[in-house]
From Swiss-Prot:
EC number, as in UniProt: 6.1.1.18
Protein name as catalogued: Glutamine--tRNA ligase
One Gene Ontology biological process: glutamyl-tRNA aminoacylation
Residue interval(s) of motif 'HIGH' region: 34-44
Native source organism of the sequence: Vibrio parahaemolyticus serotype O3:K6 (strain RIMD 2210633)
Annotated Pfam families: tRNA-synt_1c, tRNA-synt_1c_C, tRNA-synt_1c_C2
Keyword Ribosomal protein on entry: no
Main subcellular location: cytoplasm
C-alpha cells in the first residue's frame, strides 16, 4: 500500500488531490485560526487534526494564526494555552506564530481601497438601527441614509474613526453590497468598528478593529493559504469571503471549504455554556477533568494519540450528526489497554489477615508492568500478613458464578498466592471488618500441587506498605445525550459525575508522574492528577472504566 493509499479519505482531501493533479496548486498550505478568547475543546481538536494532518500528509505547511480582532475578550493567557494544546496534540506550526493583528496596517489599506472603489462607506446608524435596517430572512433590508456618501467624505470620516474622534457605537465602516440579498451576511456587513481597548499585541496603536469576515479572508491570502477549512456555520460567510477578495488588489486567491463541526453526546461545546459551567462553579475550572476542553481531557488522562485516533474515526463530512461519547471512551480505552502499565489499587478496602504468614515478614514479589509487553519491565510489590482487598470481592455465601473469595473457599491473589477464607469479624452493625485467611505457600506462580481448581483471581495491596490515595471517579457530566437541547442545560448535570473516595495503591505509584496513565487492575484506567497530587497526598483521576457501563443504561 502506498503512502497516499494509507491516508484517510474525505471530501476535502479529494478536492486537494484534484487541485494538485490539475495543477491549480503545487503545494498545500492550511491554517488553524483560533480566537484567543477561551480554551480549546475537543471540537477544536478535530479542526487541528484536520488542518495539521493535511499539511503533514501532503508535505505542506500549516500556520497557527490567532484571530485577534476583538481585544476586549482576548488575553495572552489564552494564546499560551492554545499553543500548549496544539503542541500537546502532537503538531508543530510552520514558521512563527501568526496574528491577524500583524496585518492591521495592510487591512486598513484594503479598507481604503474599498472606499475608493465606492464599495465601503462610514455609517453613523446605531448598532440597534443597523440590526433593524438589515431586515429578516423573509424581508429585505433597507439602505442606511448614510449609504451614498461620497468617496471623499467616507475617507475623511474613516480617518476620524482611526483618530479616535468617534465614540464606540457612533460610527462603523460597512461594505456596500446588496441590502436586498437573500443572504443576511451580504446586506452591507460591518467591516470596522470603534473599540477603545488595549490589544495584547498592538497595545493602544489602534482604536478601530476589523471584523472577522473582513480579516479572515485577507489573512488567508496574505499567508498564501491554499485551502481555508472551517465549519459549516460559516458556509454563508463564504460569499463575503469571496466578495472581499474579488474586490481588492491581492495576488493569492484562497478558497474556503466547510465541514461539519463536532457534536458529542453528554457534553456541550458552546463557549457560552462552558463559561456558565465555570462561572457558576458547576465544575472546578476550565481544566476540570469532566470538561470537553483539551486541558480538561489532558488532566483526566486522555492521551494525544487517543484524541487523534478519535478525530480520525469520526471522519470529515458535511453531515451534521451527534457522535456517541462511547466512541471517545473507546479510543482512550484502546490506547491505555495497549500502552498503560498495570498497577494494583483497592478503592473500597476490607482487611484480610493471612494467619499462617509470618508476622512482620515482607516478601517482595515481582510483577510484570504489562502482560503482553515484557519490554515494559517489572516492578516489586510487597506481600505481607495483612492485605487490603475490594469489599465486593468477598461474600460469605455465593453461587458458582461468583469467582472471587467466599467463606470456606479459595481464590488467587494477583501475582501472589492462593488464599482460603476461614472466618470473618464484624462490627456492631454487622459489617465485615476483617477476613481471616490461610495461604498455600506452594502456589506462588503455580497451581496447587494436589490438582484442586482455583478459578478466581482478585487484586490486593499490602495493608502495611500500601499508600493512601484520594481517588476521583469521574463520569459523564450530563445525564442526557444532548444537554444543549434542554430548556435549562444546567439542570441535566450528572450529580454523580464526580465521586471522591479514599483507597490504597501499591507503593510503586509513589513516583507516578502527572497524567501518566495506569490500568488499576480490574478497576479501570487512572492517572495522577496534575494539579493536586503530591508525594505526600496522592490523587488519582479515573480516565475511563474497563468497559462501557453506560451502554446497558442507554439500551434499557
Amino acid at each position: 500500500m502506498s503512502e497516499a493509499d494509507a491516508r484517510p479519505s474525505n471530501f476535502i482531501r479529494q478536492i486537494i488531490d484534484k487541485d494538485l493533479a490539475d495543477g491549480k496548486h503545487t503545494s498545500v498550505h492550511t491554517r488553524f485560526p483560533p480566537e484567543p478568547n477561551g480554551y480549546l475543546h475537543i471540537g477544536h481538536a478535530k479542526s487541528i487534526c484536520l488542518n495539521f494532518g493535511i499539511a503533514q500528509d501532503y508535505q505542506g505547511q500549516c500556520n497557527l494564526r490567532f484571530d485577534d480582532t476583538n481585544p476586549e475578550k482576548e488575553d495572552i493567557e489564552y494564546v499560551e494555552s492554545i499553543k500548549k494544546d496544539v503542541n500537546w496534540l502532537g503538531f508543530e506550526w510552520d514558521g512563527e506564530v501568526c496574528y491577524s493583528s500583524n496585518y492591521f496596517d495592510k487591512l486598513y489599506e484594503y479598507a481604503i481601497e474599498l472606499i475608493n472603489k465606492g464599495l465601503a462607506y462610514v455609517d453613523e446608524l446605531s448598532p440597534e438601527q443597523i440590526r433593524e435596517y438589515r431586515g429578516t430572512l423573509k424581508e429585505p433590508g433597507k439602505p442606511s441614509p448614510y449609504r451614498d456618501r461620497s468617496v471623499e467624505e467616507n475617507l475623511a470620516l474613516f480617518e476620524k474613526m482611526r483618530a479616535g474622534e468617534f465614540e464606540e457605537g457612533k460610527a462603523c465602516l460597512r461594505a456596500k453590497i446588496d441590502m436586498g440579498s437573500s443572504f443576511m451576511v451580504m446586506r452591507d456587513p460591518v467591516l470596522y468598528r470603534v473599540r477603545f481597548a488595549t490589544h495584547h499585541q498592538t497595545g493602544d496603536k489602534w482604536c478601530i478593529y476589523p471584523m472577522y469576515d473582513f480579516t479572515h479572508c485577507i489573512s488567508d491570502a496574505l499567508e498564501g493559504i491554499t485551502h481555508s477549512i472551517c465549519t459549516l456555520e460559516f458556509m454563508d460567510n463564504r460569499r463575503l469571503y469571496d466578495w472581499v477578495l474579488d474586490n481588492i488588489t491581492i495576488d493569492c486567491r484562497p478558497h474556503q471549504y466547510e465541514f461539519s463541526r463536532l457534536n458529542l453526546e453528554y457534553t456541550v461545546m458552546s463557549k457560552r455554556k462552558l463559561n456558565q459551567l465555570v462561572t457558576e462553579k458547576l465544575v472546578n475550572g476550565w481544566d476540570d477533568p469532566r470538561m470537553p476542553t483539551v486541558s480538561g481531557l489532558r488532566r483526566r488522562g486522555f492521551t494525544p494519540a487517543s484524541i487523534r485516533e478519535f478525530c480520525k474515526r469520526i471522519g470529515v463530512t458535511k453531515q451534521e450528526n451527534m457522535i456517541e461519547f462511547s466512541s471517545l471512551e473507546s479510543c482512550i480505552r484502546d490506547d491505555l489497554n495497549e500502552n498503560a502499565p498495570r498497577a494494583m489499587a483497592v478503592l473500597d478496602p476490607v482487611k484480610v489477615v493471612i494467619e499462617n504468614f509470618e508476622v512482620g515478614a515482607v516478601e517482595n514479589l515481582t510483577l510484570a508492568n504489562h502482560p503482553n509487553k515484557p519490554e515494559m519491565g517489572e516492578r516489586e510489590v510487597p506481600f505481607t500478613r495483612e492485605v487490603w482487598i475490594e469489599r465486593e470481592d468477598f461474600r460469605e455465601e455465593a453461587n458458582k458464578k461468583y469467582k472471587r473469595l467466599v467463606l470456606g473457599k479459595e481464590v488467587r491473589l494477583r501475582g501472589a498466592y492462593v488464599i482460603k477464607a476461614e472466618r470473618v469479624e464484624k462490627d456492631a452493625e454487622g459489617n465485615i471488618t476483617t477476613i481471616y485467611c490461610t495461604y498455600d505457600p506452594e502456589t506462588l506462580g503455580k497451581n496447587p500441587a494436589d490438582g484442586r481448581k482455583v478459578k478466581g483471581v482478585i487484586h490486593w495491596v499490602s495493608a502495611d506498605k500500601a499508600l493512601p490515595a484520594e481517588i476521583r471517579l469521574y463520569d459523564r457530566l450530563f445525564t442526557v445525550p444532548n444537554p444543549a437541547a434542554a430548556e435549562d442545560f444546567a439542570s441535566t448535570i450528572n450529580t454523580d459525575s464526580l465521586v471522591v473516595i479514599n483507597g490504597f495503591v501499591e507503593p510503586s505509584l509513589a513516583s507516578a508522574e502527572a497524567e501518566q496513565g495506569y490500568q488499576f487492575e480490574r478497576m479501570g484506567y487512572f492517572c495522577a492528577d496534575s494539579k493536586d497530587s503530591t508525594a505526600d497526598n496522592l490523587v488519582f483521576n479515573r480516565t475511563v472504566g474497563l468497559r462501557d457501563t453506560w451502554a446497558k443504561i442507554e439500551n434499557q
